[in-house]
Swiss-Prot record:
KW Lyase (keyword) present: yes
Originating species: Streptomyces avermitilis (strain ATCC 31267 / DSM 46492 / JCM 5070 / NBRC 14893 / NCIMB 12804 / NRRL 8165 / MA-4680)
Cofactor(s), by name: pyruvate
Keywords: Cell membrane, Decarboxylase, Lipid biosynthesis, Lipid metabolism, Lyase, Membrane, Phospholipid biosynthesis, Phospholipid metabolism, Pyruvate, Zymogen
GO cellular component terms, semicolon-separated: plasma membrane
Record's protein name: Phosphatidylserine decarboxylase proenzyme
Record-linked PANTHER family: ARCHAETIDYLSERINE DECARBOXYLASE PROENZYME-RELATED
Protein family per UniProt: Belongs to the phosphatidylserine decarboxylase family. PSD-A subfamily.
């Protein structure tokens, strides 16, 4: 059964929190240009791209309801598995690349308590570049049934703003919305030693739906 607190009627779509700085001006510009287009032929040349941009922004910042999959660890992000790497401390890092066409809202991979939310300044190189590990990022730590789980939201060349939704000390349920990366980028999750990965490089993931560990 899906998680009761995050499941909702299918087909319902909301807009992501933290999107208003981009949505409000583009939608307002589109609305104004459409009004002016009725009176001026020249204004139609502005109305078409302005309306297309507003429609694109509404699509980019969609935040659909999800029926949350039960499992020990679920994907925190929509995207494609970019890499799976063993870490020196025994953990396994699963990196998920988020394109501008993916849903940008990230979700809690497990239930637990947010023990740390740290913003680290950095660069803005493309997320598929190895140097993106030095990009601006937000490092999360969760106290869960599996122990400490680390998750990192990494900004990319386009995504230059990460918006955490919940502060340190918050108790979250698996699949809860916890943050937004504007226009996509990358999310890394570190699985504890002894937890086997059940996804592969190139596989598509859906936040709150795709399970990334194996029993």
């Amino acid at each position: 059964m899906p998680h009761s607190q995050t499941s909702a009627p299918r087909g319902r779509v909301r807009l992501a929190r933290g999107a208003s700085p981009w949505l409000l001006p583009t939608v307002a510009t589109a609305a104004l240009s459409l009004v002016r287009a009725r009176r001026s032929g020249a204004a139609k040349a502005v109305a078409v791209p302005a309306t297309a941009l507003a429609a694109g922004m509404l699509w980019f910042f969609r935040d659909p309801e999800r029926e949350i999959t039960q499992g020990r660890v679920i994907s925190p992000a929509d995207g494609v598995v970019q890499s799976i790497m063993p870490w020196k401390d025994g953990r396994t890092r699963v990196a998920i690349f988020m394109s501008p066409l993916n849903v940008h809202v990230n979700r809690a991979p497990l239930s637990g308590t947010v023990t740390s939310v740290e913003h680290i300044p950095g660069g803005f190189v493309p997320a598929f570049n190895k140097e993106s590990e030095n990009n601006e990022r937000v490092v999360w730590h969760f106290d869960t049934e599996l122990g400490d789980i680390e998750m990192i939201q990494i900004a990319g060349a386009v995504a230059r703003r990460i918006v955490p939704y919940v502060p340190q000390g918050t108790k979250v349920e698996q699949g809860d919305r916890i943050g937004l990366i504007r226009f996509g980028s990358r999310v890394d999750i570190y699985l504890p030693e002894g937890v086997d990965v059940d996804v592969e490089v190139g596989q598509k993931t859906v936040a709150g739906v795709t399970r990334i560990d194996r029993d």
